């Protein structure tokens, strides 16, 4: 952390990933300091994956003052409490996944990109019934987003042609992480609903991004989504713990019939006042993700952790 140079080195472990999106959205809101990404090693400020960070670094840095902002869909199985760190999670659900390995100072929601302010003021024509924005890990060993399942259901209901799919699996229309933020928010705005049938989400950035332009969701009513999502929920009938190559994760099970009913309900909703009401509620709820004072909060936390070195 180079306070004299007005730079804060921030550990973000990847580029084409949700953590980098959060980093850039936070960076937009910093006026006094510039955030500089560090890919390789922890720093004073960390926006990163809970499982990999805690299991790899928490015992090494257990006495190091730092800010750790974490998200993950996977259970953390071992680690050490970082007594001098400020630790934030993106959702109450992520706190559960930590299994008590590390203390948590609070829930800190990721902010949306500020292009949302311009986009929500634009008068756009809706072109898609649904947008699916979801990627699976490149090696395909962990199926968490259920993209192919989603596409199959949409085809059965003759809804595939009215759905925009941004992904890296299945017959997607656009590849993930090829759009700039303005293009992404415009496409979300052009959709009536964001559609996610994920087995679980630590937070779920695209749903929050959709809500920031008034686009509600059809979503699984569990994990982090249950904390903030607005739209048409699909209640799971059970949850199992699934072993993956990345670790253990919750798999919230949903019935095909419930998914079909929700998709058909969405198609009917856009014909009535139902849709305008959901859109207004989504926009109102998205105020929780404006985070105008994030710089002041982070700087205050820096002073606190450094004071107790």
Swiss-Prot record:
Q: Does the keyword Glycosyltransferase apply?
A: yes
User: Which cysteine pairs are joined by S-S bonds?
Assistant: none
**What Gene3D superfamilies does this protein map onto?**
Glycogen Phosphorylase B
Entry's Gene Ontology molecular function annotations: glycosyltransferase activity
Keyword Nuclease present in the record's keywords: the answer is no
Q: For this protein, what is the EC number? A: 2.4.-.-
InterPro entries from the UniProt entry: Glyco_trans_1
> Keywords assigned by UniProt?
Glycosyltransferase, Transferase
**First-tier enzyme category under EC:** transferase
Q: Which family does it belong to?
A: Belongs to the glycosyltransferase group 1 family. Glycosyltransferase 4 subfamily.
The protein's name is Putative glycosyltransferase 48
Which organism does this sequence originate in? Answer: Sulfolobus islandicus filamentous virus (isolate Iceland/Hveragerdi)
């Amino acid at each position: 952390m180079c306070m004299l140079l007005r730079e804060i080195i921030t550990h973000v472990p990847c580029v084409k990933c949700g953590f980098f999106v959060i980093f850039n959205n936070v960076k937009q809101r910093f006026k006094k300091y510039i955030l500089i990404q560090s890919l390789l090693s922890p720093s004073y400020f960390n926006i990163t994956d809970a499982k990999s960070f805690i299991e790899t670094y928490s015992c090494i840095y257990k006495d190091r003052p730092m800010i750790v902002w974490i998200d993950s869909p996977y259970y953390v199985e071992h680690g050490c409490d970082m007594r001098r760190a400020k630790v934030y999670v993106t959702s109450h659900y992520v706190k559960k996944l930590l299994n008590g390995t590390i203390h948590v100072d609070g829930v800190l929601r990721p902010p949306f990109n500020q292009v949302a302010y311009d986009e929500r003021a634009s008068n756009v024509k809706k072109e898609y019934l649904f947008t699916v924005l979801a990627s699976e890990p490149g090696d395909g060993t962990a199926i968490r987003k259920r993209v192919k399942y989603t596409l199959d259901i949409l085809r059965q209901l003759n809804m595939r042609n009215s759905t925009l799919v941004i992904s890296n699996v299945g017959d997607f229309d656009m590849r993930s992480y090829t759009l700039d933020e303005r293009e992404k928010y415009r496409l979300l705005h052009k959709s009536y609903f964001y559609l996610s049938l994920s087995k679980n989400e630590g937070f779920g950035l695209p749903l929050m991004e959709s809500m920031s332009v008034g686009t509600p969701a059809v979503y699984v009513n569990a994990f982090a989504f249950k904390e903030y999502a607005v739209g048409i929920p699909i209640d799971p009938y059970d949850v199992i713990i699934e072993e993956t190559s990345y670790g253990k994760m919750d798999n919230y099970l949903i019935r095909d019939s419930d998914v079909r009913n929700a998709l058909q309900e969405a198609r009917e909703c856009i014909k009535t006042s139902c849709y305008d009401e959901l859109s207004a509620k989504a926009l109102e709820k998205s105020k929780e993700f404006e985070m105008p004072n994030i710089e002041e909060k982070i700087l205050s936390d820096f002073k606190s952790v450094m004071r107790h070195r």
